[in-house]
A protein has these predicted regions:
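Glycine-rich, aromatic-lined ligand/substrate-binding cores of catalytic
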Residues: 205-290
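Predominantly a Rossmann-like dinucleotide-binding segment in NAD(P)-dependent oxidoreductases
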Residues: 138, 146-237, 291, 383
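N-terminal Rossmann-like dinucleotide-binding module
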Residues: 1-63
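Beta-strand-loop-alpha-helix segment that lines the small-molecule cofactor/substrate pocket
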Residues: 88, 94-147, 162
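C-terminal capping/lid region of NAD(P)-dependent oxidoreductase domains
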Residues: 6-10, 138, 165-169, 378-389
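A structured beta-alpha segment of the ubiquitous adenosine-cofactor-binding alpha/beta core
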Residues: 67-86
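C-terminal glycine/acidic-rich active-site capping loop/insertion
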Residues: 1-6, 244, 249, 278-360
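Receiver (REC) domain switch-region micro-motif
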Residues: 45, 89, 170
């Protein structure tokens, strides 16, 4: 692992958070991931709309009380006025706030790391994309976190290097099973089960954002049309909790996705399969250290992380450990933070960098997921008719 850019820059990035209090699982994941490589220092935050949770989280994070805010607008204003103000902010709020918070901090000259989904609607996403494009000096990353796994990046490189021949089929599923019943107290439900946060099709903002981004990341293909069927299988639920998609790609390439919150017995479920003319790739998030490369006419290969001589540069760059030591979710998430930080350093130092290695999901990737989301919603409303993207 190289620390040359960090050493050249001479200090950690001053980092802040909006959302992600102690009552948030993903907030702690962001903090763990950012700390892994010594590139970020948490110096400020509007960590919760609940003042008690915000204060408690700030205390646990050892923040100066003067830099613990209960309003992200006040945080953006005051931090932008400080010589030692935050340089990067992570947005870990529900999606209906992502666009507003992102644009505010970007307008103050602060780079943004945004949780998925990018926004609540496609209209907001396109507007945010335009807003970012008008500020070319700003960095913007969407945390499509599973793209940080070493073997996911290895799969991407293998596809691009022609190991599968011509890609013919792309399949990506996320059938999780922990949400078989609905909370009777509506106010205690997660945003994914409250349509006011992201519509009745919020399953696409949660697990769908991962499958859509993963399919494009690995295959390099962007769908041109989608057919979708969605269902509510849980009594009392207001949002769809199961969805099936068919996708068409340029050149006759086919795709399929299954999203679910009610796949009973599944702890997680994220997996992809890419089939080409010469072979195929299979990967599962619950077994992240195994990538199966299947060939036509000869035995399959089981690829594992930790072998610099057996992996592409892209796959090896994402490895943290030598062979035999499991790589995990937080390490994969941390790869996004590391790549973002090194991109930040390189830009500040006027240095070039290899974008194949420093791969961060951009606002354009976030917009892509929202385009598929909106097309799928329209298709479902039209009884599964094909909708062009």
């Amino acid at each position: 692992m190289s620390y040359q850019l960090l050493r050249a820059f001479g200090r950690r990035i001053r980092w802040g958070m909006v959302g992600g209090g102690l009552d948030s699982l993903i907030g702690e994941v962001h903090r763990l991931s950012a700390r892994l490589d010594n590139r970020f220092e948490l110096v400020a935050g509007a960590l919760s709309i609940d003042p008690a949770i915000a204060a408690e989280t700030a205390a646990v994070c050892l923040l100066d009380t003067s830099r613990s805010y209960t309003d992200f607008r006040e945080m953006a204003e005051r931090e932008s006025e400080r010589e030692d103000g935050v340089e990067v902010v992570t947005i870990a709020t529900p999606p209906h706030l992502h666009a507003e918070v992102s644009k505010l901090f970007l307008s103050k000259g602060i780079d943004v790391i945004c949780e998925k989904p990018l926004t609540r609607t496609l209209e907001e996403a396109v507007e945010l994309e335009r807003f970012v494009a008008e500020r070319p000096k700003r960095l913007f990353m969407v945390t499509h976190c599973y793209t940080g796994y070493p073997l996911v990046r290895e799969a991407r490189a293998l596809v691009r290097n022609g190991a599968l021949g011509e890609v013919r089929q792309v399949e990506c599923d996320f059938p999780s099973g922990p949400f078989m019943t609905e909370n009777s107290d509506r106010n205690r439900r997660h945003w994914r089960f409250r349509p006011e946060f992201m519509g009745k099709e919020a399953i696409f903002g949660e697990v769908g954002a991962h499958t859509i981004s993963m399919a494009q990341f690995v295959s390099g293909k962007t769908p041109i049309a989608v057919s979708a069927s969605m269902s509510i299988l849980t009594e009392g639920r207001e949002t769809f909790d199961d969805a099936h998609l068919l996708l068409r790609y340029p050149g006759g390439v086919l795709g399929r996705m299954w999203l679910s919150f009610v796949a009973a017995g599944n702890d997680h479920g994220l997996a992809f399969r890419v089939y080409g003319t010469k072979g195929s790739l299979i990967w599962r998030q619950t077994e992240p250290d195994t990538l199966l490369l299947q060939h036509v006419g000869r035995p399959a290969e089981r690829l594992i992380p930790g072998h610099p001589d057996r992996l592409t540069p892209e796959g090896w760059h994402a490895c943290r450990l030598r062979e035999g030591h499991p790589e995990g979710y937080v390490l994969a998430f941390g790869n996004l933070y590391r790549d973002f930080a090194d991109t930040f350093f390189a830009r500040k130092l006027g240095q070039t960098f290899d974008e194949r290695l420093f791969r961060i999901p951009t606002v354009q990737d976030g917009v892509h997921t929202m385009r598929v989301y909106e097309a799928a919603a329209q298709s479902n409303q039209r009884s599964g008719s094909w909708v062009n993207l």
